[in-house]
């Protein structure tokens, strides 16, 4: 693993689709869901770490603390921004913000990832 700089940022803009929407409120409730937002936060953080990983390494999410603060209709774009706040060995903590295309902040919080050795990880999880 190469040294990961504190302050490293990454952004990803996503056009929301019906598959990313909530469904439990019934027809007509076409809004971007919290699970979709969390998945996009993880993907954005992961993408920022890829250039710092050695062959055989990967990062996995281990903690997320996010508030989904405003609804966004399906069809709008959202932009996820992750910024490295802290690096401690193989542990990396990100500050996260999510805005919709209207500029409204719809989510914020933190996300933690760990750098793992894939073969070792697979061995540990094999019998479970």
List the model feature ranges, each with a label.
Residues 8-10, 60-64, 76-80, 90-92, ...:
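A generic structural signal for short beta-strands and their flanking turns/coil linkers
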């Amino acid at each position: 693993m190469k040294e990961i700089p504190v302050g490293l940022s990454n952004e990803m803009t996503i056009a929301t689709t019906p598959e990313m929407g909530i469904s439990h409120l019934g027809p007509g409730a076409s809004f971007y869901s919290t699970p979709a937002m969390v998945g996009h936060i993880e993907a954005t953080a992961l993408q920022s770490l890829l250039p710092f990983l050695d062959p055989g390494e990967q990062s996995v999410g281990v903690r997320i603390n996010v508030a989904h603060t405003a609804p966004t209709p399906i069809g709008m774009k959202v932009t996820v921004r992750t910024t490295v706040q802290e690096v401690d060995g193989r542990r990396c903590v990100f500050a996260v913000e999510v805005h919709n295309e209207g500029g409204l902040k719809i989510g914020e919080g933190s996300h933690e990832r760990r750098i793992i050795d894939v073969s070792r990880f697979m061995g540990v999880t094999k019998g479970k």
